Amino acid sequence: MELKTMYFDTNNTMYLKVVSKKFVDKLNEGYNYLDDEYKIATLDITDDLFYKCSDDCVRECFNNDSSAHLRMRKTANELVSFTDYKNVFGQLRKDSVFVLQVFPKFDDPEFQMQEITDGNHGTIYKANRFYLGEKFDLGDVEVVKFFIKKGTDIHLHYDSIQRWAFDNRKTEVSMYLFGFSFVRGLDNFKVLAKICRDGNLELLRLLELNGFNETIKLYAIILSYISFQPLLTNYLLTKSYNFQKSNITVSNWKATMPYGTIDQYKTKVLLMAIANNHAELVQYLLTQNPSDKDINHAMLYAVTTANASLLDYTLKNGGNIHYKNDQALILAVRFNHISMVRKLICLGMDSNNVFALTMAAENNHQDIVQHLINRGADVNANNRSALIAAVKNGHLKIVQMFVNNGADIKIDDTVIKTACKNGHNNIVKYLLGKGVSCDDIVLPSNSSFFSIVKLAVKRSIIVNNDKSNKIK
């Protein structure tokens, strides 16, 4: 493979920029296809956001420089970062998709360029004037091979490129990278977890060839099982001495583990079991001398799944009901588990939790809102944030709950203005009927918000005819 070189500047220096698909899509919005080969446009960019140029700009660019692919100009003195062949893999992020050629425009009188050394990612360059050339797909193993051939430091950035390949399910790239001799230092469990998540049998076999010991093999069985990957599970069972295909259970797996090895990856397995909703495995791991963190993770899992018995078990064994700033109550509200909300409050959690009340109001969880109010939640706390959330999202019944329990809707025009702004005419009608004045709403006469209220008045939506409700 050979990358095209374009001679845009006297120095003929090429760099590389790793970009996401979103970045390229923004570029494509500005592309104007004049023929099959050249994409010509002049773009101004700010913070990596690209704006489509006019046809006049395109014609001017085409007439002045018919060899250009894409010319980019940075607004003001802002700089765009890029790198070189050696460090290109150090710039990878999970959403990276392409590598673009970058040619600094050294002959531009406003050209600026910086060079920054980063111990983790290698050398980074920044410039405000440059051309972009070809784009190359990182998922193409031939592109990866080419970069390595051109001097990419695979030893320094191996973890970065291999992690990217796993996260983006680029099997061919992963298999090629496994061929390097220094791979034996890789975290086998981390790689194994990703393989089991994806159900990739090819990579599982390749991992075996690169140091798949008996302990890792046994973990692989349970990880494939809790990841719902029967193809991998059945493959691993054919290589295990202690499992029967028809009887994959936690106790069976436990019996096969060499003494002491269960603790090695216990927390990681626990988190995977929680993520995949395997209550049996969660409960078993909690009997294996769990750390405080393990117990609290399991407690939060019990709340999100409304598992009362598991919640009781975790609390009995040291779980902290207030872990991570009362996350248990927040999760119970988020997942609309009224039974968990009741239980947690009975266990001593503060019902006057503004964030919990606001979240319940925002998501129209009426039973939870009523229960929190009944247990003493302040409906006017934090500048009436819960009330405003209900109004903003158009939840009339919850607004009525708040008003019936003392919410202050007349202290200023925030509540009715929010209802107007979001077009909730039923709430506007209700508020006006409750005596909220619209005289003091400070909005321009041509405002759509103002028009909504005016329309409400014209159509006799107001329940009472108090002068304070009229708009002149």
Swiss-Prot record:
Pfam families: Ank_2
Stretches forming ANK repeats: 125-156, 187-216, 265-295, 297-323, 325-351, 352-381, 382-411, 413-440
Record protein name field: Putative ankyrin repeat protein L675
SUPFAM superfamilies, per database record: Ankyrin repeat
Keywords: ANK repeat, Repeat
PROSITE patterns tied to this protein: ANK_REP_REGION, ANK_REPEAT
